[in-house]
């Protein structure tokens, strides 16, 4: 028996709403930290799920650190985050597997249209979890002839692009406000699990 848990997460929208919804359905608590500039509508949608929600005066990556620190200080506190770092990889891997379901559904829809293999796959990236899941799925689906993968980031939060440009296999971090109109992509630190996939399989 796990007892009463408190789920901690950082988000600027959909992920936090999902965590709050799941916590509510499971009879648990949720604490959601949103970065500076998050929309009031998204805040209210998360709050409607019963979560304790705050909009902080820091960027997304700092909100992730805040959520992790608070979880560590809370009895039965659990970080539910879709980005991974050293020592925190299991839950992000589960979330990426969930994202892979969308890739599977897309592949099935393509087959229904008699398109057996896409030539190119375009996917957006924040920390890279969704992108890593999509690239990983299609790479495994077509191991001998995978599509060309193109990942798009917000210009002000281009951590994956900078890592690719460096060419040494190491991830790069972008700091600051990460100001962009692309809600959900204002992330300056890549998921280490997805980085290992993307750096080996993405064309652009």
Language model features: what each stretch is:
Residues 2-8, 17-72, 159-173, 194:
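Active-site-proximal loop->helix
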Residues 5-6, 78, 120:
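Structural motif
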Residues 13:
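Conserved catalytic/binding loops enriched for acidic/polar residues
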Residues 16-17, 132:
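Residues forming the Rossmann-fold NAD(P)(H) cofactor-binding site
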Residues 30, 53, 78-79, 149:
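Hydrophobic beta-strand scaffold residues
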Residues 33, 56, 82, 152-154:
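Generic beta-sheet signal
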Residues 61, 66, 85-201:
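Glycine-rich phosphate/pyrophosphate-binding loop at beta-loop-alpha junctions
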Residues 73, 77-82, 93:
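Structural signature of the thiamine diphosphate
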């Amino acid at each position: 028996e796990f007892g009463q848990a408190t789920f901690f997460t950082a988000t600027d929208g959909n992920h936090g709403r999902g965590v709050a919804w799941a916590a509510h359905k499971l009879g648990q608590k949720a604490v959601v930290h949103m970065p500076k500039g998050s929309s009031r509508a998204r805040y209210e949608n998360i709050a409607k799920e019963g979560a304790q929600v705050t909009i902080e005066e820091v960027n997304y990556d700092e909100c992730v650190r805040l959520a992790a620190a608070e979880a560590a200080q809370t009895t039965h506190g659990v970080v539910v985050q879709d980005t991974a770092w050293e020592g925190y990889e299991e839950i992000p891997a589960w979330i990426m597997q969930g994202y892979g379901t969308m890739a599977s559904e897309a592949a099935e829809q393509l087959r229904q249209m008699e398109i057996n293999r896409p030539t190119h796959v375009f996917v957006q990236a924040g920390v890279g979890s969704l992108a890593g899941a999509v690239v990983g799925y299609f790479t495994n689906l077509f191991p001998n002839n995978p599509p060309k993968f193109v990942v798009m980031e917000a210009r002000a939060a281009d951590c994956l692009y900078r890592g690719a440009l460096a060419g040494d296999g190491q991830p790069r971090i972008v700091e600051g406000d990460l100001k962009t109109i692309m809600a959900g992509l204002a992330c300056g630190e890549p998921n280490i699990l997805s980085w290992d996939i993307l750096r080996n399989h993405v064309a652009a």
